């Protein structure tokens, strides 16, 4: 009986040892798995950093001498294919439909293209044109032609008003008022009513203005003026000026005066040469 009891104790001891070994083995396996997982995560993180580093490097433009503007890096052979734009001469035929100020017989013709709603045109008319007029128009040195560029319905209605009577004096008077009062009518929902009021200042009744708005001939002249200059190679908008067919760079008094003086001198030399023949 005693021997059986000893055997049972021994078996229980062996069983306990086996369980501890199994637990130790499981613990070791768990530690191995966790260690491998950590290694894998570390490896993934390292790989991701490498990818990010590569992507970042690709997105950075090296700051060296190769990072230059097209003007510097463009080969000379390629530049020759794109030479600077030269002045292009446009032939203008002045006719009875044109509003001409100054000397209609002058060989120096200055053509102004304007839009009634153009703020720069209004600025030119009030600040630069008076000096130009005094210097060249009032002295009958040039023929100054005023032509419209129609961009909006407001432009069309205002231009029709200025041309309603058809003579230069009426045009000049209404043209002046339209540009001086531009900020009052051009951007108003009631611009037609305001233009009608302006017309009355120039001696045009509401009924006359209404008839002019329905005058296809006036509209055709305005559209023809617009289409003609729109085809000019260097035309970029209003106001624009052409001196004997050559467009000026801008509308400053110095730029226009330089172009006009040059044209006058050329005509003077031409006349002198013709007399010597």
Swiss-Prot record:
Organism superkingdom: Bacteria
Location in the cell: Periplasm
Main location: periplasm
Segments forming domain Thioredoxin: 76-265
E.C. designation(s): 1.8.-.-
Classification via CDD domains: DsbA_family
Signal peptide: 1-22
Residue segments, region Disordered: 34-80
Disulfide feature: 118-121
Biased composition (Polar residues): 39-80
Gene3D superfamilies, per the entry: Glutaredoxin
PROSITE patterns per record: THIOREDOXIN_1, THIOREDOXIN_2
Keywords (A to Z) from UniProt: Disulfide bond, Oxidoreductase, Periplasm, Redox-active center, Signal
A GO CC annotation given for this chain: periplasmic space
GO molecular function terms noted in the UniProt entry: disulfide oxidoreductase activity
Family per record: Belongs to the thioredoxin family. DsbA subfamily.
Free-text function comment from the UniProt entry: May be required for disulfide bond formation in some proteins.
This protein's name: Putative protein-disulfide oxidoreductase RC0029
